Amino acid sequence: MIPVTSFAGKTVAVFGLGGSGLASCHALKAGGAEVIAADDNAENVAKAAQAGFITADLRDVSWAGFAALVLAPGVPLTHPVPHWSVLKAREAGVEVIGDIELFCRERRRHAPDAPFVAITGTNGKSTTTALIAHLTKVAGYDTQMGGNIGTAILSLEPPRTGRVHVIEMSSYQIDLTPSLDPSVGILLNVSEDHIDRHGTIAHYAAVKERLVAGVQAGGTSIVGVDDGYCRDIADRLDRAGKNVVRISVKNPLASGIHVEHGTIVRTAGGARSEVAKLGGIGSLRGLHNAQNAACAAAAALAMGISQDVLQDGLRSFPGLAHRMEQVGRRGNVLFVNDSKGTNADATAHALSSFADIFWIAGGKPKAGGITSLTGFFPRIRKAYLIGEAAQEFSGTLGTQVAHEISQTLDVAVEHAARDAEASGLTDAVVLLSPACASFDQYRNFEIRGTKFRELVQALPGVKPVV
């Protein structure tokens, strides 16, 4: 745990008592603050009370004595409308911050030179975060990984020399971190997402920009420049005098890091050097993972990690569950769990990575459906449609792609495995990449992906991928 000493002797309200909120309560209390815990969920309030915290309905207390409101990232700060606790705080002139802001203040107080790598982007954040954490561990760092990837930042060990914090940040978390100042900041990409919480794509992109704009003096801002928003951001950072490393997997760069034919290449001052090779690394398959790997490589190089260690780390990276996860093989058939593919953009990355696909798709549909994926239809040998989206997706596939409405995941896995094996194709792939949320049949994408893995591994003759 990281004791938060910056509010010692003061009273702090914490709203939102899930994982990060409860960790904030413990960290503030350990640092000497008085904590008033609150949540709209009575169950969460009861848990906080059982943990020994003072709880209250913040609508019924005076805000005059609060030094800050620590807000959970899932609570609306601005859009669609600010949460009532935010309005109360603003009326009382109380600053509204998040748990990562508390971390930043503690780092500046106690270990300002401790490495702090922050990662954001619309897609690829978790894989890049996990990959950088893996690389730093291979390089011998005491590595602490957390943030949006799942572990509350304040439950990690405190910053210190030789210890690196590798932190995934959502746009919500950036919004709540006004003094964000990583030593290495990474912006992978920006595409339309979470507009319900940010109002416009311009505001969403501006929030993302703050992570790389806030990099501390002497640090490195790493920006993927394969979309227009990020190209503009990189140019603005240049003009502001930041040390910018541009990343591309689509075009060679005169200065920066790009990927060509499976090789990560660095160019600077007219010189070109090969940094690492991605060929044969199953956990980093696909153009999207090439971008993740290139950004991670740039971070590793910025931290002084050698190319030999970098290459070893890339090759030994196991990948993340539910993200292009190779869960088994039977004869000519590879089974891939990409349950994290909850929208068409994410699924496009998976479909672009294989040639002969038996595709399991569907769930709770999102706006636009799969119409943007028509360019990948020639790669799909047959589709197996599940959940609420089945009829809609069937209409989009029409006569272009052979398909069936399997309705449930167990039926889809059974039929896709049978058809893929019977196809005689050398590299057939049964791919779960639903292009949908899971909520019609599963509580979250993790449970859906775990069910897929279990179904595959229960098939006779399926072996682990080595």
From Swiss-Prot:
Keyword Ligase in record: yes
Residues binding ATP: 121-127
Domain of life: Bacteria
UniProt record, GO biological process: cell division; cell wall organization; peptidoglycan biosynthetic process; regulation of cell shape
Subcellular localization(s) per the UniProt record: Cytoplasm
Main EC class the enzyme belongs to: ligase
EC numbers for this chain: 6.3.2.9
Record keywords, A-Z: ATP-binding, Cell cycle, Cell division, Cell shape, Cell wall biogenesis/degradation, Cytoplasm, Ligase, Nucleotide-binding, Peptidoglycan synthesis
SUPFAM superfamilies cross-referenced by the UniProt entry: MurCD N-terminal domain, MurD-like peptide ligases, catalytic domain, MurD-like peptide ligases, peptide-binding domain
Disulfide linkage: none
Reaction catalysed by this enzyme: UDP-N-acetyl-alpha-D-muramoyl-L-alanine + D-glutamate + ATP = UDP-N-acetyl-alpha-D-muramoyl-L-alanyl-D-glutamate + ADP + phosphate + H(+)
Stated family: Belongs to the MurCDEF family.
Protein name stated in the entry: UDP-N-acetylmuramoylalanine--D-glutamate ligase
Source taxonomy: Bacteria, Pseudomonadati, Pseudomonadota, Alphaproteobacteria, Hyphomicrobiales
